[in-house]
Amino acid sequence: MIQHVIPVPPLCGGREILDTKASRPLGDAFPKEPLGSAFVAYQDDITKGFFRSLKLISIAGNMIYCLSDLLLQHRNDRASHIALIDGQHRLSYAELIRQTERCGVQLQAAGVQRGDHVAIYLQRSVESVVALFAVWSLGAVVVIINDVLKNRQVNYIIDHSEASFLITDNRLRTSLTECPLSPDRILIVDSGELAGEKFTPSRVIGADLALIIYTSGSTGMPKGIMLSHNNLISGARIVTDYLHLTRDEIIVSLLPFSFDYGLNQLLTALLIGGTLVIQRSLLPADICNTLNRERITGMGAVPMVWQQLAGDRSPFTKTQFPHLRYITNTGGRMPESITKLFRQTHPHVQIYLMFGLTEAFRSTFLPPDQVDVRPGSIGKAIPNVELLVLNERGELCKPGEEGELVHRGANIAIGYWRDPENTAQRFRPAPFQQGKGGQTEIAVYSGDYVKTDEEGFIYFIGRKDQMIKSHGMRVSPEEIEDCIFASRMVLHAVAFAVPFDEVRSTIVIALVPSDHKSFSQKELSLYCKANMPEYLRPDVVWQLESFPLTSSGKPDRVRLKEMYTEQNQKF
């Protein structure tokens, strides 16, 4: 499958996880928490000086310590079950394991060793899944690169991550110039059969670094977030828990693996022994065809995709999907008008609204039975996480009081690769935990403003660096955008402010109309006047054909503001 290719090991080489206090293997004396056919054991673990809650997961009697175990647990009991569907290509768990181990042999032959950083620059595909698990089985670190990125961004990530090897294909390889790696370190995917040498996996433990995932760059140069095997397995387990997933799930993959939730969908599907269907086309008609053809049970997407599916020309709201059990939203707030529409057109489908940041994966989810009751809420903390809302003095906020969201507990990343300054700023000692003995617990200070209601449900206000001052009030861009979406006149909208003078700001709403021919700025202005208080109303309506997007499919707010500023400086 790959010239200089990629694979996985037999339960990670039979390694043991040691109790750090007693220096003995963890055994039955360790507490276990039932989870259907699975159980979880907890251990306090120290990872690079940070306190972590280590979760060990058992499915069908096999302990899961590292990511390659997600596959290997199914070697016998799910061998013939379909693990991946990519167009006409259907791969069983047995074949996926075989291809991964074969790929690992070639990676070893190419010189990949434990601890090496290996960049993967491929589209979502069977080949990219094989590459991921082959690298992990060797104890190497994946640096995942979105295939929509261009030469400059790809070379930056390869260089900054200190990648020793690059796995790509001929199509993407030809687009790369001035690559920091020598040609013998660039491994090209092909479809050839490989020699049958025996694969020898490396010893891997859960605390090992598994992934460096680069942020989309919507807030400046992308930062490399370091995630351990424990981080990624814990994230998959927690999502499995609150979505109530079973091994009968057929999950459609719309999001890139370089986006944390896109990768989580893959890991979750493999954790439960389900099926992942890779869907590259984001055209509403193509998505709808896949939902019914493959009998999809679960789908996750970002607001841009939901807005397209909710459009007047989309078949999504006019088609029934009897097998679809749930949908999840992440990467931004889903407009209330869209959740109401989906509740009307697909009342049997459960809607999970989620919120998180890559540094802690997921922080909150709003259960489906609360979507109608608490419009605008992002929910409460996910399992094994505590969320605190702190004011500028570091004190707990009262209900209704705005403050910064602080995440403590599961899923906290190791830090930023080669960026100690930003690591120290974002990953800080957990509040109210100092002086309790033991290692210092680290929390993630999100930089997001939120508030809670009397029952503890959280409401997102906005990022610290994106808040808008209007008529003496602090306004969230999302609040303006929600009002604009409710008009049903626009497909996409982003609000931001630019200086008007030394004191005042101009609120700009950049938008893509639902129908360019019938759209009227005058009608939208009348709608805003009738439905929005003055401090929320945009001063400028900026109509565009399309938006620049980040690599994770979100509107690039920084670039939009730059484009508007550049355009208006010409006059």
Question: Which stretches of residues belong to each language-model region?
Answer:
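Conserved AMP-binding/adenylate-forming core of the ANL superfamily
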Residues: 59-64, 72, 80-125, 129-133, ...
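Conserved pre-ATP/AMP-binding loop-to-beta segment of ANL
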Residues: 80, 197-214, 220-221, 244-250
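Conserved AMP-binding A3 loop
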Residues: 92-94, 210-234
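AMP-binding/adenylate-forming catalytic core of the ANL superfamily
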Residues: 166, 291, 299, 409, ...
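Conserved AMP-binding/adenylation subdomain of ANL enzymes
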Residues: 233-250, 257-298, 312
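Gly/Ser/Thr-rich phosphate-binding loop
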Residues: 296-301, 310-374, 386
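Conserved ATP/PPi-binding loop(s) of AMP-dependent carboxylate-activating enzymes
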Residues: 380-384, 395-432, 475
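AMP-binding/adenylate-forming catalytic domain of the ANL superfamily
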Residues: 532-554
